[in-house]
Amino acid sequence: MNLGKLNKTVILIDTDYLNQKIKENIEFYRDLYPDKELNTLNLYQLIYNFIVNARVESDERNIDVLFAYRLSDSLLYSTNPGNVWNFANAENLNIKEFNVTIRSFFADEDESCSKHFTIMFKMLHRSNSVDRVIMVADSKDLNNAFQFSPELLEKNLFLFRDDHDTNIDFPINFVNIAYMIAQSLGLDRGEW
């Protein structure tokens, strides 16, 4: 697997984890607000929310978004666009003031999505061009990687995960992923 030429800031997404969180939160907010139409999450708005809430510097306009996924499970729950397989050949877009390149990389048949994510994260760590990694993930595989390779914590890291229910035992700045999903569904701050 070759991740190609990368920008200074990379968002790395564990697709299985993101999918689980999208499903949980959409169902939660549908129950909480039955009168609201909460049918589809805009993926590009979610990516923008990740960028802004991870406090990407204003001079960093070029950002890579990499999806780690399994071939058998490339669909995102109730999301548009909803198939990360479509990003296999890279999609370049402008999301508000940012130039974003979205790509996806599938795992080997015998590899879990979280394991594949961890392998990709280690590759990003070795890349001299990458200064900051924004992760959408939470797994024992990732925690074990930090435990057995503490040098992985040397890059500027940021994490989107749950507030309390986490597998990560290391001090990494994070924002609750539920807030990003709620924002992307169009809910006001007082509603989440």
Regions found by a protein language model. Name each.
Residues M1-F105:
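Domain-level signal for Mg2+-assisted phosphodiester chemistry and nucleotide/NA-binding surfaces
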